[in-house]
């Protein structure tokens, strides 16, 4: 690979990162580490798990990122009574045709927000395993590929909170990053209060296409990483 050519491709493909960051900063006050982690997962094709108490803009950050990208987005609110079929889909009998037809679930989207994923029992959490690892879902006897790009962005509450279920190790391993979100700084909290009092709302419009993300990921895979950086 020609280094000069690769550098030029990186500059071209990374131009949208600044625009995404600017768009996120218009809505999210502070939380730089959160924004950076979401962008790393987006470019590295790795699922991201955000952990923090309610009210720290975890869900808002994910929704804002998805709104900045012209792609299909779905949100799954995990609750104790949720079923695996509510996540991946199921077979539905059609009286008209007298056959079973596939009804796809909300996991069939480019960006899937698994909100409060540890509010549901392990049986429901595991419904995402095949989708996250193999980018496909099996319903009945049929296997369906998921759209590209496919990214699961999940939020969870600290495990000591009431009504939470610990994520199985196999589920945790499917996430590339786990980001623990802390409270914003004092000045940031003051700014959040002022924005809420003034009713400031920023309209978020798509500035990026899904195909551009796929192309950027190809460039990321070409970046050379010496083994000393991850073995020392």
Regions found by a protein language model. Give the residues of each.
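Short hinge/gating elements
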Residues: 2-7, 22, 110-114, 157-158, ...
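Pre-Walker A (pre-P-loop) alpha-helix and adjacent loop at the N terminus of AAA/AAA+ ATPase modules
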Residues: 14-47
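Walker A/P-loop
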Residues: 43-78
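P-loop NTPase switch/communication element
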Residues: 84-99, 150-151
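Conserved alpha-helical scaffold flanking the Walker A/P-loop in AAA+ ATPase domains
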Residues: 94-112
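Conserved AAA+/SF3 P-loop NTPase catalytic/coupling segment centered on the Walker-B
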Residues: 109-132, 165-169, 186-190
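Canonical AAA+ ATPase core
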Residues: 134-207, 215-222
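Conserved small/polar residues in nucleotide/adenosyl-binding loops
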Residues: 230-231
């Amino acid at each position: 690979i020609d280094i000069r050519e690769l550098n030029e491709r990186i500059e071209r493909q990374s131009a949208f990162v600044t625009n995404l960051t600017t768009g996120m900063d218009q809505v999210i006050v502070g939380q730089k580490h959160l924004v950076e982690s979401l962008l790393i997962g987006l470019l590295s094709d790795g699922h991201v798990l955000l952990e923090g108490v309610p009210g720290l803009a975890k869900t808002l950050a994910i929704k804002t990122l998805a709104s900045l990208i012209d792609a299909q987005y779905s949100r799954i609110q995990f609750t104790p009574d949720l079923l695996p079929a509510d996540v991946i889909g199921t077979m539905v009998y059609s009286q008209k045709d007298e056959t079973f037809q596939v009804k796809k679930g909300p996991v069939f989207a480019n960006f899937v927000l698994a909100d409060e994923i540890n509010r549901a029992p392990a049986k429901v959490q595991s419904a995402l395993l095949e989708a996250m690892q193999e980018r496909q879902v099996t319903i009945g006897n049929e296997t369906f590929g998921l759209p590209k790009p496919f990214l699961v962005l999940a939020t969870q509450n600290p495990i000591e909170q009431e009504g939470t279920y610990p994520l199985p190790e196999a589920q945790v391993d499917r996430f590339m990053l786990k980001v623990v979100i802390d409270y914003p700084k004092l000045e940031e909290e003051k700014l959040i209060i002022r924005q809420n009092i003034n009713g400031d709302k920023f309209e978020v419009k798509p500035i990026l296409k899904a195909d551009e993300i796929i192309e950027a990921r190809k460039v990321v895979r070409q970046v050379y990483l010496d083994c000393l950086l991850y073995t020392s």
